[in-house]
């Protein structure tokens, strides 16, 4: 059983304490009613992982943990087998005591694009919305954040996060809660809020931007990364049944339109800091994610288009401030 008690104790002593008015009841309800059919199998994989304290831990340049003495072949095999029980691994990579988890996404590439444009994360309390396995939260901690809180309702991601945390010596500087942002009260408590790869999955993108704003302190920073298309401030793609084989893609604006949306929601100092096409080197099938990936979603005769005929995935990073 994954225990959230450490997180409750942690926030009871800081400026997130008002969250305790609603959070424990939400988590108790989730534990009672909403668990996935494979959750016990996944949580058992976490439970059977060895307790290891890393001798060397690098979260600044990667997510890497090493022991003082090399682990035995049997210990490494045990870790690898248990981590493979948590496949598919989408966000990473992780290097843990000789087990190299080559995830579908090179999330480190995205982090390298985002990091130079951020306000200094030192001492900050951060919310990562749709955090997946938690890879970027560990990189936030490596960049000096005091506390990183991730929310993602996908229960496999929760177990992946807890598995990595256990192999990082049960590090309590990052926490993942199995919730969606619509379940959060307006906490107004985070110095930086990240929403990366979420906006296009929301039926109401402006409502999502308001929800993000409600989590920020005044003068807090929003980091927004999402799919975009080329065009002016009035250009928005509303895909039909699917986009790149995904059913749950609703709105893909131009970067300029997205800037206007942020302005409409009351954000200021809005900057488009990066725009790049997603490549099949950054998102691809691996031994740790063996099903279809980006190359299967693109037109085989014209990789500038999806199989549906839409522009191929292009992503923008925007940074804005809540006044």
From Swiss-Prot:
InterPro entries: CmoB, Mo5U34_MeTrfas-like, SAM-dependent_MTases_sf. Its EC number is 2.5.1.-. It catalyses: carboxy-S-adenosyl-L-methionine + 5-hydroxyuridine(34) in tRNA = 5-carboxymethoxyuridine(34) in tRNA + S-adenosyl-L-homocysteine + H(+). Disulfide bonds: none annotated. SUPFAM superfamilies: S-adenosyl-L-methionine-dependent methyltransferases. Carboxy-S-adenosyl-L-methionine binds at residues 91, 105, 110, 130, 152-154, 181-182, 196, 200, 315. Coiled coil: none annotated. Keywords: Transferase, tRNA processing. GO terms for biological process: tRNA wobble uridine modification. It is an enzyme of class 2 (transferase). It comes from the Bacteria. One of its GO terms (molecular function) is transferase activity, transferring alkyl or aryl (other than methyl) groups. HAMAP family: tRNA_carboxymethyltr_CmoB (MF_01590). Catalyzes carboxymethyl transfer from carboxy-S-adenosyl-L-methionine (Cx-SAM) to 5-hydroxyuridine (ho5U) to form 5-carboxymethoxyuridine (cmo5U) at position 34 in tRNAs. Homotetramer. Belongs to the class I-like SAM-binding methyltransferase superfamily. CmoB family. This is tRNA U34 carboxymethyltransferase. It comes from Escherichia coli O139:H28 (strain E24377A / ETEC).
């Amino acid at each position: 059983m994954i225990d959230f008690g450490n997180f409750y104790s942690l926030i009871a002593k800081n400026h997130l304490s008002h969250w305790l008015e609603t959070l424990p009841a939400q988590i108790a309800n989730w534990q009672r009613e909403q668990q996935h059919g494979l959750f016990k199998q996944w949580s058992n994989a976490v439970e059977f992982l060895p307790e290891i304290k890393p001798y060397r831990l690098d979260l600044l340049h990667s997510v890497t943990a090493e022991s003082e003495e090399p682990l035995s072949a049997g210990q490494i095999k045990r870790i690898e087998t248990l981590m493979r029980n948590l496949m598919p691994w989408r966000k990473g990579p992780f290097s843990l005591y000789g087990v190299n988890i080559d995830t579908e996404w090179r999330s480190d590439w995205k982090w390298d694009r985002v990091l130079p444009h951020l306000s200094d994360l030192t001492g900050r309390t951060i919310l990562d919305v749709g955090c997946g396995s938690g890879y970027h939260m560990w990189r936030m901690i490596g960049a000096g954040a005091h506390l990183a809180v991730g929310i993602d309702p996908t229960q496999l991601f929760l177990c992946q996060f807890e598995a990595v945390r256990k192999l990082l010596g049960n590090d309590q500087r990052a926490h993942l809660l199995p919730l969606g942002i619509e379940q959060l009260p307006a906490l107004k408590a985070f110095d930086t809020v990240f929403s990366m790869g979420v906006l296009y999955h929301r039926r109401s993108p402006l409502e999502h931007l308001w929800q993000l704003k409600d989590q920020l302190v005044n003068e807090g920073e929003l980091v927004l990364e999402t799919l975009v298309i080329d065009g002016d401030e009035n250009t928005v793609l509303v895909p039909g049944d699917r986009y790149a084989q995904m059913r749950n893609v609703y709105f893909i604006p131009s970067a300029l339109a997205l800037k206007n949306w942020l302005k409409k929601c009351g954000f200021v100092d809005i900057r488009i800091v990066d725009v790049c096409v997603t490549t099949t080197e950054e998102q691809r099938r691996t031994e740790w994610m063996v099903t279809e990936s980006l190359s299967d979603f693109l037109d085989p005769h014209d990789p500038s288009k999806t199989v549906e005929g839409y522009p191929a995935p292009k992503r923008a990073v925007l940074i804005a401030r809540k006044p």
